[in-house]
Regions:
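Bacterial N-terminal signal peptides that target proteins for export
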Residues: 1-12
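A short linear-motif detector with a strong N-terminal bias
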Residues: 4, 20-23
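Hydrophobic alpha-helical context, especially transmembrane and signal-peptide helices
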Residues: 5, 17, 43-45
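Bacterial N-terminal signal peptides
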Residues: 10-21
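Mature soluble binding/inhibitory domains
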Residues: 23-157
Length: 157
């Protein structure tokens, strides 16, 4: 009897230990949508623009609000090579079930003139409260493409 009870206990423990990693993995799988990424965000941008004259450092800090339909608007203060500007922006985002996303953002100067259009690739982590982003493209209003190495670190507020 004692031997049978110990054998059963050992089998139950072995099954539990074998199944535990699968249960943890199942809990880690996230299914994201625009609802996951909706909310108020704060962010910093860092990197370089690659101009014909060479690489120029870029940094920015800003915030935006994104709705459940993937629309967003916000503002930032950015420095490109030491030249500071206040900018506003509007855009759209499509958030995928695997928690990746693509943003298309139109950026405007203080007078409301279009300055550039940026396409960004993002991944949401920490239950949709953290975003890591890389710029896919930066295009000026005349169609000129600016090569860049820019990233954004964002936090849902």
């Amino acid at each position: 009897m004692k031997h049978t009870l110990l054998s059963r206990f050992a089998i139950v423990m072995a099954v539990a230990l074998y199944a535990a990693p699968a249960l943890v993995l199942a809990q880690d799988i996230q299914h994201c949508s625009n609802a996951t990424s909706a909310g108020r965000w704060g962010f910093t941008t860092n990197g370089v623009l690659i101009l014909p004259t060479g690489a120029v450092p870029v940094t920015a800090v800003g915030h935006f609000v994104q709705d459940l339909h993937g629309n967003m608007e916000g503002s930032q203060v950015r420095s490109v090579g030491g030249g500071v500007a206040h900018e506003t922006f509007t855009g759209t985002v499509t958030t995928n079930p695997d928690c990746t996303a693509k943003y298309t953002i139109s950026v405007y100067d203080d007078s409301g003139n279009l300055v550039r259009i940026s396409v960004l690739d993002a991944v949401f982590t920490n239950g949709g409260r953290k975003a890591r982003v890389v710029f896919e493209s930066v295009t000026l209003p005349d169609g000129t493409s600016l090569p860049s190495v820019l990233s954004i670190d964002g936090d849902k507020q």
